Design a protein with these regions (language model features):
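Iron-sulfur-associated redox domains of electron-transfer enzymes in respiratory
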Residues: 1-114
Length: 114
């Protein structure tokens, strides 16, 4: 994969913040700007995790809340070259902020600028 390719790993969680993470990742995929890897697979498939260390391009790890599950799981694989973002860093409050296209697009624009 080319180094300018964006690969997203997102923790979709069970709240509005996780929903933001998932929607952002899927919109990036749908637009052809990124590919997405399954977060859970990193925990259960060590071969997949090893193979993912090379050739993912720019890796964006997108968490939905301050627990930062995605970041922790990726760190456990030994992958260290990634950009970590949290939806709560964009003025989104867990359990409060409704999912809106405006906020989703704001996160996408931030990722595009990285």
């Amino acid at each position: 994969m080319e180094s300018n390719t964006i690969t997203v790993v997102a923790c979709s969680g069970a709240s509005n913040t996780g929903q933001y993470s998932d929607v952002v990742a899927r919109k990036l995929i749908k637009s052809g700007q990124a590919k997405m890897l399954c977060l859970a697979r990193f925990s259960v498939d060590k071969k997949f995790a090893e193979q993912s260390k090379a050739g993912v391009g720019k890796l964006i790890v997108l968490d939905g809340c301050p627990i930062n599950c995605a970041e922790k799981i990726i760190n456990e694989t030994g992958i260290t070259d990634f950009i970590h973002l949290n939806t709560t860093d964009f003025g989104i409050t867990k359990g409060v902020t409704p999912v809106t296209d405006e906020k989703v697009e704001g996160i996408i624009k931030h990722i595009q600028a990285l």
